[in-house]
Amino acid sequence: MTNANVDATPLTTKPSQDGFYMPAEWAAQQAVWMIWPYRPDNWRSAGAYAQATFAKVADAIGGATPVYMGVPKAFLAEAQKVMPSHVTLVEMDSNDCWARDTGPTVVVNDNGECRGVDWGFNAWGGHNGGLYFPWDKDEQVAQQMLKQHGFARYSAPLILEGGSIHVDGEGTCMTSAECLLNANRNPELTKEQIEDLLRDYLNVKQFIWLQDGVYMDETDGHIDNMCCFARPGEVILHWTDDETDPQYPRSKAALDVLQNTVDAQGRKLKIHLLPQPGPLYCTEEESLGVTEGTGVPRTAGERLAGSYVNFLITNNRIVFPMLDPATDDIAAQKLQEIFPEYEIIGVPAREILLGGGNIHCITQQIPSGK
């Protein structure tokens, strides 16, 4: 499939005015988007290892949901060799491959219609701690995805990555202050103004603010690496029992918030604790495979922000990252207990983690709307 013409004319209304809202991830999905990894200054061996891992993730998702892969023209032939045949390749320019953060948030209404929210994007901080420059192609990704599906587009006046929000589909939005209130995202806006915009564009009513995300998360603490909804009234929190670990105070503070809050429906939350893998660190061999560029350096000995919470719910499957042989089986068992009606599929995902994220970060679901 070739690059679709981008519709430059956004709607002048807001989703909440039009009766549209962001559904929960467990709502039925018509597709999942991914983007081809190729940056040599972020992915070792010019992305070769990551590409093989992305193919395994796409294969795991494809058993439940159609997969679209955005690929720059120069890499289409290579992607055809690597990707499973069921993956639909779409010619698309991008600066990197984080579909969760550069793709649209698709909102739905009660009639089953879909539209998309196109957020502002500045590569996780712009010139104040951002992860690479330029990001001009990434700014066009959401429009291209929406055009591919023929969805109308809302243009939101807010710098926001999809990985920084989770919703329960019933009026609750969960996020982190470390990211959304960071001075390198929307310094001109107050917390209240940000909440108002999220009400407008997600059609949510209540917010659960955790202070911090996962230790050493270079996105400034995205919620999707730290905590997510399992179903209405239930959340899953990244956890360690080791009080000497720098992650412990972050997870403990989050637990305190979650234990003392209610969702938009007035429910107290049931909290599941998902164990932390590792700790995990970048090796010398892994760091040497990354070339110098505008991306953040990958340094040997640097702690990686590994988390099993960074999984994707897609129709009848949970696709989660396998990160540590010592804890992978424990994580899989815990996820099966939380999601007894789902098929739990693990994919070895260290190569994604080395680039700064994981399975949830590299995917963006398109709800069915039905």
Swiss-Prot record:
Pfam families registered for this protein in UniProt: PAD_porph
GO molecular function: agmatine deiminase activity; protein-arginine deiminase activity
GO biological process: one example: putrescine biosynthetic process
Disulfide bonds: none
InterPro entries: Agmatine_deiminase (IPR017754), Peptidyl-Arg-deiminase_porph (IPR007466)
Active site: 361
Keywords linked to the UniProt accession: Hydrolase
Enzyme nomenclature, EC number: 3.5.3.12
Transmembrane segments: none
Reaction(s) this enzyme catalyzes, per UniProt: agmatine + H2O = N-carbamoylputrescine + NH4(+)
UniProt entry tagged with the keyword Signal: no
HAMAP family: Agmatine_deimin
Similarity comment text for this entry: Belongs to the agmatine deiminase family.
Protein's recorded name: Putative agmatine deiminase
Encoding gene (name): aguA
